[in-house]
Amino acid sequence: MRFTISTSELKSLYLEKRDDLLVIDARPYSDYALGHLPNAVNIDLVQFHWIDTSKEGISQFNKQMKIILSNIGVTKNKFVVFYDSISGMFSARGVWLLIYFSHSKTAMLDGGFNKWKKERLKIETKSNQFIHSYFRGKPNPKVLADFGYIKSKIKKKSNNNVLILDSRSKSEYEGSVIRAAKAGHIPSATNVDWSCNINKNGAFKENTELEKLYSHIPKEKEIITYCHGGYRAANTFVVLRNLGFKNVRMYVGSWGEWGNKIDLPVER
C-alpha cells in the first residue's frame, strides 16, 4: 500500500467532488492563512509531539490523539490527505498517526503545498471550519515502539531480527550536536538522515533511488525508526512502508525521551 499521493491524483479527487475526502494542512496557521488547498482544514501538527512512552504516557497519548482526530473530522470512511510545504515531516506524522490508529485510508501529498502552487492549481485563503466527528480508530501497537520495548531488544545482543534506524542528522547521531541531557544515539542504531529521502524540489526521490538509499536494511527485519521528536522518523516510516517494508515501528518518544532518561544507554 502506498501512503503518498501526487498532485495530479489529488486534483482528480477534487474534480470528482468526493465527499469522503478530508484534506489537512499540517503547517503553522500563519502559512495556512496565506493560502492553502481547497476545503483544507488546518492543524499545526508540530504542536502535538509526545515524549512520554511509559504505560500511562501511551494511554494519555491515545486519548489525546483520538480527541484531536475527532475534532478535525476523521471518520472510518474518510480518505485523509495531509500536506505541509514539501514532502515533509509534519504530513508524515499525520499519516503515521492514522496508520497507528488502524486507519489505512490516508496519504501525504508528494511535494506538498509548494509543488501544488508551482503547478498553478487552485488555492484559497478562507479558513475552513472543522466538522467534528467521533473517531473510533483502534491503536495498533505493532506500529509504535516505546522506550521499554527498545530497551528489551537492545539488551538481547543475539537478537538480529530488529534494526534501529536513526533519522536524525549525522551530527546529532554522532553526538556533536546536543539537544538533550545526553548526546549520541541508541546503541546499535544505524543512521540515514531523513533529508536524504527528498529531492531539492521538495518531493520524494524516486523509489529506485530510495531503494538504493536503504539497500543495506533487510526487509525481513523489524525496523524501528526514531529521531528527536517523532517527526523526521515518521517521514522515514512512510518511505519504508512505500518501499514494501512490512514490519516498521516508530519510536514516538524518540531522542527527546531517550536522551533525557539517565538510566537508558547511549552510544557515541
Q: Positions of the model-derived regions?
A:
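Cytosolic catalytic domains that perform sulfur/thiol-centered chemistry
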Residues: 1-268
